Regions:
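Cys/His/Pro-rich metal-binding microdomains
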Residues: 37-45, 101, 126, 168, ...
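Post-signal peptide N-terminal segment of secreted/secretory-pathway proteins
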Residues: 87-126
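Bacterial N-terminal signal peptides
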Residues: 8-17
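Positively charged n-region of N-terminal signal peptides that target proteins for export
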Residues: 1-5
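Residues immediately within or flanking Cys/His clusters that coordinate Zn2+
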Residues: 32-41, 93, 97, 122, ...
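A cross-kingdom marker for long, charged
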Residues: 364-371, 375, 379-439
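Short N-terminal segments immediately surrounding and downstream of signal-peptide cleavage
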Residues: 22-42, 46
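Primarily the internal scaffold of c-type cytochrome electron-transfer domains
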Residues: 23-26, 48-87, 115-123, 131-381
């Protein structure tokens, strides 16, 4: 087993402990944040072009500032749409409201801000890499190992489990940073997240080369997708079982439920049964998209566990129609099952045979009507993309085959241009054509 796989497997094994001990938010905020300006010197990360003799690009600041949406996140709060959301919520100025600042900038406590720190920088370096107070100077020294920087508070973004926990804090919400249904009701855009896809959105400020691998271990996109699905599913259950964050009065926090279970036109007659829920029409159901995707992961790793996940997911859905106690008990049982399976997922070698199993399992679910909602189909499309890229990286397909598959993948995404005009049958046809063209 390679070192990177062992590290990921160990961190996944410790998933429940990590959730209970130090969250990603707490880890990021553990040390003083010195500000983006402390990283943007032209001989550090603020160069205008890539340094050829450096183990990092050194123009990371320019890439972030010019092309990364994170750099513009704070500025969005002063837009008319943001001001209207804040007005509806009754929280005052969006550029000063904690619930907005927590995700639209680096909202570290005032006592933890260095002299060059600026809230207006948006989601900057230390929002993801952790407070640089102890590692800023050390990480520039080539003689200092990456592990030493991590020990000084640098956040382990190369570890897919910890990266997923970090990203979910804002891209879906966690128990210590809840993004509630009230925020959505006030007009905030729907949230969606998939680790592998979102890691590569936009222009990356790093290159996975031999030097990167030597310092941080192998990179495997499908494994990142798989681990990310497991962490996202665990995060849902973590919130659902938290009496303070996951419940509002007698109801679970509604943001944990599927948007499209309720948000349909009254004239819509598209309801149909889903094997994955076992529920009838007119029932508000949990957003189980990550649980469904993780079942496709397990199809390639442990078929028995995949069946167990299906049964326990159905039991959770059933429990939500019974009582609060039944829901929490079912969620805890399912979360335990996830924790037991994830070390095997992290250690699994996703070869061409595994990729075929995953893609076939997704296509089979599509044909039986499991992706009845837009958000489920969206997750299936991102999963298919990770699989296709992995086929290419493994050498299982040549350039011509890869181009053909990407054409089929484009057709899948074309069915997802709008959630208002989305057609399940069109998606089924597109994903079937993609599967037929795969190796």
């Amino acid at each position: 087993m390679r070192l990177r796989t062992w590290i990921v497997a160990v961190s996944v094994f410790l998933l429940p402990a990590l959730s209970a001990a130090q969250s990603a938010v707490e880890a990021i905020d553990a040390h003083k944040h010195l500000g983006v300006a402390s990283c943007s010197n032209s001989v550090c990360h603020g160069a205008s072009q890539v340094f050829k003799d450096s183990h990092v690009m050194q123009n990371e600041f320019a890439i972030w500032q010019e092309t990364d949406p994170h750099a513009k996140a704070y500025a969005l709060l002063d837009k008319p749409a943001s001001r209207e959301i804040a007005r509806k919520l009754g929280i005052g100025d969006a550029t000063k409201a904690k619930v907005c600042l927590d995700c639209h900038t680096d909202n570290i406590a005032a006592s933890q801000r260095g002299e060059r720190f600026q809230v207006s920088d948006g989601v900057g370096c230390e929002s993801c890499h952790g407070g640089a107070e102890q590692w800023l100077n050390a990480h520039a020294d080539k003689k200092v190992a990456h592990a030493d920087n991590l020990a000084k508070g640098m956040y382990p973004t190369s570890d897919p489990l910890r990266r997923a926990q970090l990203c979910l804090g804002c891209h879906m919400g966690t128990r210590d940073r809840m993004i509630t249904h009230r925020i959505m009701g006030a007009g905030h855009p729907r949230l969606s997240f998939e680790l592998d896809t979102f890691t590569w959105l936009g222009r990356p400020h790093y290159v996975i080369d031999e030097d990167w691998i030597a310092r941080k271990g192998d990179w495997n996109g499908v494994r990142d997708w798989a681990v990310g699905q497991g962490v996202a599913a665990d995060n849902l259950l973590d919130q659902l079982t938290d009496a303070k964050a996951g419940w509002q009065g007698i109801f679970p926090e509604l943001v944990l439920f599927n948007c499209y279970a309720c948000h349909k036109r009254m004239s819509d007659k598209s309801w149909g049964p889903r094997q994955g829920t076992g529920l009838g029409p007119g029932v508000v159901r949990l957003n189980d998209t990550n649980l469904s995707m993780y079942r496709h992961v397990l199809a390639a790793v442990d078929k028995g566990a995949a069946q167990q996940l299906l049964e326990q997911t159905r039991a959770l859905h059933r429990a939500t129609t019974e009582s609060r106690d039944a829901t929490i008990a079912a969620a805890k049982k399912l979360r335990s099952m996830l924790g037991e399976s994830m070390p095997r997922v992290a250690a699994h070698q996703f070869d061409a045979a595994s990729l075929n199993i995953i893609l076939a399992d997704i296509e089979a679910d599509a044909q039986r009507g499991e992706f009845r909602d837009y958000d489920a189909a969206e997750q299936a499309a991102m999963a298919a993309q990770s699989v296709i890229v992995a086929f290419e990286a493994s050498g299982a397909i040549d350039k011509t085959k890869g181009e053909a598959l990407h054409g089929k993948l484009d057709a899948v995404y074309a069915t997802l241009k709008s959630d208002t005009g989305w057609s399940m049958s069109s998606f089924q046809s597109a994903i079937k054509a993609l599967r037929a063209a795969a190796p």
